[in-house]
Amino acid sequence: MRIVLLGAPGAGKGTQAQFIMEKHGIPQISTGDMLRAAIKAGTELGLKAKAVMDAGQLVSDDIIIGLVKERIAQPDCANGFLLDGFPRTIPQAQAMKDAGVAVDFVLEFDVPDEEIVKRMSGRRVHSGSGRTYHVVFNPPKVEGKDDVTGEDLVIRADDEETTVRKRLDVYHQQTAPLIGFYGKEAEAGNTRYVKIDGTQPVDLVSKQLATILG
């Protein structure tokens, strides 16, 4: 079972990825983890990637696709894998297809931008412990204070509304076109494309995924 997850940051992909991995016993493949592992292992692709990164440049799609192919050939991917955060662009998706990497399911987590802004900009964190709250969905007992220590809660830079909106803009420009690409792939019978309402409660989304993936 080879799965690609699509959806904006804050759409709930991470939570559901965990559910799918545990239920189906397949690993989640993150390009960041792959790059770090290849560089540490000193593989040919790892050394190429390191040279590019040391020069302050972006790692090319060719290197990333090569790493993906190496990674999915490993024994823990025998029953499939879960790709989250890759492919991000149509050229990457096309290169993956050309490299013979088949995808069984493309799952798109659909959440309106305003809902994502509300979810992410409402997060509050206790710096000392990492405890996370939400002003609407999981408020602290005392506004702005950690339940355990009574210390101030902070907003992480990543959760600031302006940052969230910038990340959403990048997603819509780069990754949203993939929805059309994989829609055509599904019409051609090359994959199954499923759009999921990410505004539903977490357990309902998990149930829906269990039905879709079997």
UniProtKB/Swiss-Prot annotation:
Entry-linked InterPro entries = Adenyl_kin_sub, Adenylat/UMP-CMP_kin, Adenylat_kinase_CS, Adenylate_kinase_lid-dom, P-loop_NTPase
Keyword annotations for this protein, in alphabetical order, are:
ATP-binding, Cytoplasm, Kinase, Nucleotide biosynthesis, Nucleotide-binding, Transferase
Q: Which GO terms describe its biological process?
A: AMP salvage
For this protein, the record's Pfam families field holds:
ADK, ADK_lid
What Enzyme Commission number does this protein have? 2.7.4.3
Q: Which domain of life is it from?
A: Bacteria
Q: Where would one find coiled-coil regions in this protein?
A: none
The GO terms this record gives for MF are: adenylate kinase activity; ATP binding
Query: Where is region (LID) located?
Result: 122-159
- Residues that, per the record, bind ATP: 10-15, 123, 132-133, 200
Q: Where is this region: NMP?
A: 30-59
| Compartments, as annotated in UniProt | Cytoplasm
* Chain residues that bind AMP: 31, 36, 57-59, 85-88, 92, 156, 167
Record bears the keyword Nucleotide-binding: yes
What's a single GO CC term here?
cytoplasm
Q: Is ATP-binding one of the keywords UniProt gives this record?
A: yes
Q: In which pathway does it act?
A: Purine metabolism; AMP biosynthesis via salvage pathway; AMP from ADP: step 1/1
Reaction(s) this enzyme catalyzes, per UniProt:
AMP + ATP = 2 ADP
- Tell me, in a sentence or two, what this protein's role is: Catalyzes the reversible transfer of the terminal phosphate group between ATP and AMP. Plays an important role in cellular energy homeostasis and in adenine nucleotide metabolism.
Domain-related comment: Consists of three domains, a large central CORE domain and two small peripheral domains, NMPbind and LID, which undergo movements during catalysis. The LID domain closes over the site of phosphoryl transfer upon ATP binding. Assembling and dissambling the active center during each catalytic cycle provides an effective means to prevent ATP hydrolysis.
Similarity comment text for this entry = Belongs to the adenylate kinase family.
Q: How does it assemble?
A: Monomer.
- Entry protein name: Adenylate kinase
What organism does the UniProt record list as the source? Aeromonas hydrophila subsp. hydrophila (strain ATCC 7966 / DSM 30187 / BCRC 13018 / CCUG 14551 / JCM 1027 / KCTC 2358 / NCIMB 9240 / NCTC 8049)
Top-level taxonomy: Bacteria, Pseudomonadati, Pseudomonadota, Gammaproteobacteria, Aeromonadales
